[in-house]
């Protein structure tokens, strides 16, 4: 399932060679689901062309070629902070742009009517130095952060998030955020339903499938030899009678 979502959603949304209605991406997965690792893989391939050959699924590797090495990537994880989402994003962008040799400073919040113009000006400065590259911003733990925000603060954060999603359509700027559950279905945000709906229009959600997590654990993290499987079976068999259908599912265990 995850390979299909990468091929059909993630890579097409990130690419900028073909005109498209590009949107921001939300990677949805609970703690331990591999959400952060998936974002790391996507952003690493986007940053370094040679890494795409390390993707074991041939179809995914082929589809990844449209973004491989095409981006300068900026990464951050939101922790305990009272900063607005705009201030967080602006701080990360300005710090990393300086490292890339791009001189750009965002105006203060009190000086802008909307943020799209500032993002467009930033990308114009970026493209002067890197005309063949896009800019990818990866933000983890977005949902936990939004849950800490007060009513008015949250509305401003969501409006900024919508603007970020909107500029992805016309610029070589891309945005990926990691959330623990589907942002648009979170009952805690029911009071800002209209703002959530407008954000939904400019973002694609990519859910990490449970069967893919199971496959990665079995085939990548904890792959076992036949001898190891035999020893585990011998150890577990005496306990099977205490756990429902464990006997029938022994191969999975």
Predicted regions located by residue number:
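N-terminal pre-Walker A segment at the start of P-loop NTPase domains
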Residues: 1-18
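P-loop NTPase nucleotide-binding core
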Residues: 21-139, 143-159, 186, 195
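Segments forming glycine/polar-rich beta-alpha architectures that bind adenosine-containing cofactors
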Residues: 43, 177, 253
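Short, surface-exposed basic-aromatic patches at helix termini and helix-loop junctions that form
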Residues: 45-48, 166-169, 190-200
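Hydrophobic/aromatic interaction determinants used to assemble and anchor large protein complexes
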Residues: 100-104, 128-129, 168-170, 228, ...
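Substrate-engagement module of ASCE P-loop NTPases
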Residues: 121-129, 156-175, 199-202
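Structural recognition of the conserved hydrophobic beta-strand(s) that form the central parallel beta-sheet
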Residues: 136-140, 166, 172-181, 185
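Amphipathic alpha-helical segments of the small helical/lid subdomains adjacent to P-loop NTPase cores
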Residues: 186-253
